[in-house]
From Swiss-Prot:
Belongs to the vitamin-B12 independent methionine synthase family. Its EC number is 2.1.1.14. This is 5-methyltetrahydropteroyltriglutamate--homocysteine methyltransferase. Its cofactor is Zn(2+).
Length: 772
């Protein structure tokens, strides 16, 4: 009899209950006890949602991030928070955000600002989830504190849950971190493993039979040293009284199959969506006692599983494995929304093609029933699934011959600017007349309660189009006045009218659909609601021109047009799986190209095309990067390069460790790139030690994800560090990212200090010819 289990459940709640509880606590509006109560209620409800499973994950819930929780479980706390005597949860928030609440801290451990320096944040493998990077040094020590995990396990057991604790494995944990002193992370493995032994013993003592130990690092290309680390680690853990389910996901094992199959664990989970080709070889490699868990329901996308086709493949596997077969989603369901049944306004036909987290668990129920008791026992469910899958395949809404013809007509010239960068730069300098070290922002300003209320009322039909436009124009005017008062050089209209940098565009493109409650966690309390790219994409009308033109009418300074690039639109959407992603990306590129042309016709001479998610789409295996970067860069160039030399094209990339893709970024040929660098203390600019980047660059000078306010001198120091690698005449000064999640009382002083820093740098340049 096959068993079912889950690797993890979305923690934010069907109505984003965790988000609102966190933000209330951070603002000082509610107590820690109230926050803990919300967490307990969410865990209880989520365990109920998974009640039909044979094993339910415990420990997948985190108030901020599961990697951060693992750091605290292992006693790996940054020194800068060790002096705080507060609750561990507050210390976790200090590491993640720079402070535990949005009030002044009584301690200051950073020269840059009040509070402490926030931990570095980066993408979780190739997803849109972000984790707080563990910090290591040669002197790092570990000490177990499993109190939170053990409390959740006891909570689940008391609720009658068949609990399977979930932890991040030791090798992946080390790989996820960064050695701040340049020491060898793997040198810490021998210190770390005894803490894992102690943790597993504590879980066994608390009644756990199985522990899921996540090692997604196994789907990446590992050198011999890291492969050996897996053998060392799991031979050290093999005496544990609990049974270990080693979980891999997000890709194929390939050359790591033998390693994964022969590690001394009781079971192995593989992603049978992206790594199906691993399964047949593993069947021959696995010892006869070992469980094989197959992730047969896609945990990263929202399309219904074709249950009939899955059973056709799975039934012979079940015959060979018998009771050693477990089935599950491919990965944690953290990456999909909670419940499709909440969607009361989604197009009915499109809704019938989808499955969110709860529906994916129901798909597991149908699959295991068919495997264990025959397809006849779930014939009605299988028939309904088959009808939905057939309808999607055959729907005329999915295919647009005109769009396919436009993509077929793309030529190499479609992605070429009229002149090389040096020629363009001279024309742009003469036209824009910007000072040295020009200042700008990345696009968005705070989305206030008034803005959100106006948008809600407009969508609910409580105010008409004229009233909504007037409200948005008032907000745009406020943003423009604030920027002029601060002395910024290139302004933005503030994006008051935009709910999300992807959803806003998707709502105006044919081929997209939208949920009301399809939220997924990006980091901490930050949630995104990815659009659903279900068919060929067409732009019926201009999307941003009216708002940008209005913003420009209020100022004599340059106003940036703000667009989301095709690669980011793709990577931050739930993308159709019936054609190559490259094809969908080119369709999106043509829609953005048309919008760029319309902005230019409206007199906009600075246009930013955000590609925040360019790196996110990189395959986990470096050997596959060239293909992805080829079509991604081509798509950006198609979108950006239909303009005159005088029009300055910007692009923005956040959280992008881009040292290893700098040549591809240069090939995009944007006139200006702005990037996230402040959390990494300009380490991201190391790429320029060995690569002469030809165009202009704005290294982010303060971390917008933290409420801390940088000092002018801190910003000056960062830009001086940047000027060691980038010629000062090609440097811009800007925040790391958009400001929509911040408050005006944070934004104004931070930008004021940024402008003050620019003036200091200009004065120094005039006196010495050097920055500052």
């Amino acid at each position: 009899m096959a068993l079912t289990h889950n690797l993890g459940f979305p923690r934010i709640g069907a109505r984003r209950e965790l988000k609102f509880a966190l933000e209330s606590y951070w603002k000082g509006e509610s107590s820690r006890d109230a926050l803990e109560a919300v967490g307990a209620d969410l865990r209880r409800r989520h365990w109920q949602d998974q009640a039909a499973l044979d094993l339910v994950p415990v420990g997948d819930f985190a108030f901020y991030d599961q990697v951060l929780d693992m750091s605290f479980t292992l006693g790996n706390l940054p020194e800068r928070v060790q002096g705080f005597d507060g609750h561990p949860l507050d210390n976790a928030f200090r590491v993640a955000r720079g402070r535990s609440a949005d009030i002044a801290e009584t301690h200051c451990c950073s020269a840059a600002c009040s509070g402490v320096a926030a931990g570095e944040m980066t993408k979780w493998f190739d997803t849109n989830y972000h984790y707080i990077v563990p910090e290591f040094a040669a002197s790092t020590s570990f000490k177990l504190d499993a109190s939170r995990l053990l409390a959740q396990l006891a909570e689940a057991q008391a609720a009658g849950v068949r609990a399977k604790p979930v932890i991040i494995g030791p090798v992946t944990y080390l790989a996820l971190g960064k050695a701040k002193d340049g020491s060898d992370k793997l040198g810490l493995l021998d210190r770390l493993l005894p803490v894992y032994v102690e943790l597993l013993e504590a879980l066994a003592g608390a009644g756990a039979e199985w522990v899921q130990i996540d090692e997604p690092l196994l789907v990446t290309e590992l050198n011999a040293e890291w492969q050996h680390a897996f053998n060392r680690a799991y031979h050290a853990l093999k005496a544990s009284r609990v049974k270990l389910l080693l979980a891999t996901y997000f890709g194929q094992l390939l050359e790591n199959r033998y390693l994964a199959a022969t590690l001394p664990v009781a079971g192995l989970h593989v992603d049978a969506i992206s790594g199906r080709d691993d399964v047949e070889p593993l069947l021959g490699l696995l010892p006869a006692h070992k469980v094989l868990s197959l992730g047969v329901v896609n945990g990263r996308n929202i399309w219904k599983t074709d249950l009939g086709a899955t059973l056709d493949w799975l039934e012979p596997v079940a015959e060979r494995l018998g009771e050693r077969l477990w089935i599950a989603p491919s990965c944690s369901l953290l990456h999909v929304p909670v419940d499709l049944d909440s969607e009361d306004a989604l197009d009915g036909e499109i809704k019938s093609w989808l499955a969110f987290a709860k529906q994916k668990l129901d798909e597991l129920r149908v699959l295991v029933a068919a495997l264990n008791h025959g397809r006849d026992t779930v014939s009605a469910e299988l028939a309904a699934n088959r009808a939905a899958c057939d309808a999607r395949r055959n729907s005329p809404r999915v295919n647009d011959p005109a769009v396919k013809a436009a993509v077929a007509a793309i030529t190499p010239q479609s992605g070429a600017r009229q002149s090389p960068y040096a020629v363009r730069a001279a024309k742009q300098a003469a036209h824009l007349r910007l000072p040295r070290f020009p200042t700008t922002t990345i696009g968005s300003f705070p989305q206030t309660a008034e803005i959100r209320q106006a948008r809600r009322r407009f969508k609910a039909g409580e105010i008409d189009d004229a009233a909504y436009r007037a409200a948005m124009q008032d907000e745009i005017a406020h943003s423009v006045r604030a920027q002029e008062a601060l002395g910024l050089d290139v302004l933005v209209h503030g994006e008051a009218e935009r709910n999300d940098m992807v959803e806003y565009f998707g709502e105006q493109l044919d081929g997209y659909a939208f949920s009301r409650f399809g939220w997924v966690q990006s980091y901490g309390s930050r949630c995104v609601k990815p659009p659903i790219l279900f068919g060929d994409v067409r732009r019926p009308r201009p999307m941003t021109v009216e708002w940008t033109r209005y913003g420009q009418s209020l100022t004599e300074k340059p106003m940036k047009g703000m667009l989301t690039g095709p690669v980011t639109l793709l990577n931050w959407s739930f993308v159709r799986d019936d054609q190559p992603r490259a094809e969908s990306c080119k369709q999106l590129a043509l829609t953005i190209r048309d919008e760029v042309a319309d902005l230019e016709k409206a007199g906009v001479r600075v246009i930013q095309i955000d590609e925040a998610a360019l790196r996110e789409g990189l395959p986990l295996r470096r050997s596959q990067w060239k293909t992805y970067l080829g079509w991604a860069v081509e798509s950006f160039r198609i979108a950006a390069n239909g303009v005159a030399d005088e029009t300055q094209i910007h692009t923005h990339m956040c959280y992008s460790e881009f040292n290893d893709i700098i040549e591809a970024i240069a090939a995009m040929d944007a006139d200006v790139i702005t990037i996230e660098t402040s959390r990494s203390d300009m380490e991201l600019l190391d790429a320029f030690d060995h690569f002469s980047y030809p165009n202009e660059i704005g290294p982010g000078v303060y971390d917008i994800h933290s409420p801390n306010i940088p000092t002018p001198q801190h910003i000056v120091n960062l830009i001086k560090k940047a000027a060691e690698r980038i010629p000062a005449e090609r440097l811009w000064i800007n925040p790391d990212c958009g400001l929509k999640t911040r408050q005006w009382n944070e934004v104004i002083p931070a930008l004021g200090n940024m402008v003050a820093a620019a003036r200091t740098l200009r004065a120094g340049w005039q006196e010495t010819g050097r920055a500052g």
